[in-house]
Swiss-Prot record:
Listed PANTHER family: 1-DEOXY-D-XYLULOSE 5-PHOSPHATE REDUCTOISOMERASE, 1-DEOXY-D-XYLULOSE 5-PHOSPHATE REDUCTOISOMERASE, CHLOROPLASTIC
Domain of life: Eukaryota
Taxonomy of the source species: Eukaryota, Viridiplantae, Streptophyta, Embryophyta, Tracheophyta
Species of provenance: Cannabis sativa (Hemp)
SUPFAM superfamilies: 1-deoxy-D-xylulose-5-phosphate reductoisomerase, C-terminal domain, Glyceraldehyde-3-phosphate dehydrogenase-like, C-terminal domain, NAD(P)-binding Rossmann-fold domains
Name this polypeptide is given: 1-deoxy-D-xylulose-5-phosphate reductoisomerase, chloroplastic
Amino acid sequence: MALNLLSPAEVKALSFLDSTKSTRFPKLCPGGITLHRKDCRVPLRRRVHCSLQQPPPAWPGRAIPEQDLCNWNVPKPISIIGSTGSIGTQTLDIVAENPDKFRIVGLAAGSNVTLLADQVKRFKPQIVAIRNESLIGELKEALADVEEMPEIIPGEQGVIEVARHPDAVTVVTGIVGCAGLQPTVAAIEAGKHIALANKETLIAGGPFILPLAHKHNIKILPADSEHSAIFQCIQGLPDGALRRIILTASGGAFRDWPVEKLKDVKVADALKHPNWSMGKKITVDSATLFNKGLEVIEAHYLFGADYDNIDIVIHPQSIIHSMIETQDSSVLAQLGWPDMRIPILYTMSWPDRIYCSEVTWPRLDLCKLGSLTFKSPDNKKYPSMNLAYSAGRAGGTMTGVLSAANEKAVEMFIDEKISYLEIFKVVELTCDKHRSEMVTSPSLDEIIHYDSWAREYATTSLKSSSSPRPVTA
């Protein structure tokens, strides 16, 4: 079986930022983002290194397991931020199947009182938080018959207390959006290792989070399938061996749709993912390919990869979860069924590998699968890639603004306030507006401020723009 991979720099875009102070970005031509493709026929004249800026030792590719992560003779104590969401419920499935390996210390949720109460009764945590403070009374009432009542703390402070509970060793961060940033900071400062399923933590807060993790000697272990795959592939590589990261994408709900048909997309269409079972927001992100654009930025921060050395390939079967290319042109890949439990389990058990019964964890059979296929992503169908690469190259607060604007746009689309194609327009307009205020090395307060600003601006961006820059479907 031959892997027909993308050549380096297959999908690149000019920045929408003002380039007057930089030689890296040509100025925009009127009418929006202009695409340029490198001439792939020109031979490589130098050895390609994955990054000019070395990542801190906290990055998982060079993480060395310490004694507190090895040889657990008792169940490892875990806290979950976002326990009622897709990541949280799958994490609890793993804990339920492996009670001798893991135990739950803390649970934090947003507003799903019924499910949270059921989780508390089953897993018996020591501390519980519900972010929606108005629901604290309802939660206490639902837990009135519990023999050992956990400590219950409402609001954002409650979520932070769950994240930094002294008994937890690892914190699984499954909250969608920038809401996961402050709990992650609290967990790192309290010395907890992070099982990171919240993309926005690094996309918005990478310049702040990584030095903080380095300072506290904390391991940030990726719990999404693509970055977990990269993490697994690069372990054991010597310094300087990594040449290129290749992120695979299913193509989402519209991978087989003609571009012309996208103007007719309904919410129900976007929520039909062909391979994965996920929450609404990430499923729409898979349809727009914004999830992959955000993952490019996350890979940059996690693995120190330069954007010129991070590529995307459409892989409809979602069996290869991502690949790396080494300096000698070898390609290493991690394969498995599309099951989020596998990368989640690995972040919880790392550096160990836990046996999983094939009754509940089907084993991969390539002979039965038959074939794996690959193709280049379509820039016209997925304008999100251009926006993400541009924001990533800009860095600073621009990546957080991109993420927040997309999150708000997806919310408006699901609520049927905007059309599918307007998701891309909202994000581009918001990023374009932010370019004059972008902060290159933001503080945590600035990251949070511009996250809030982006959501607010995105809400009215289509109305407030007198001459919006067009985004081709």
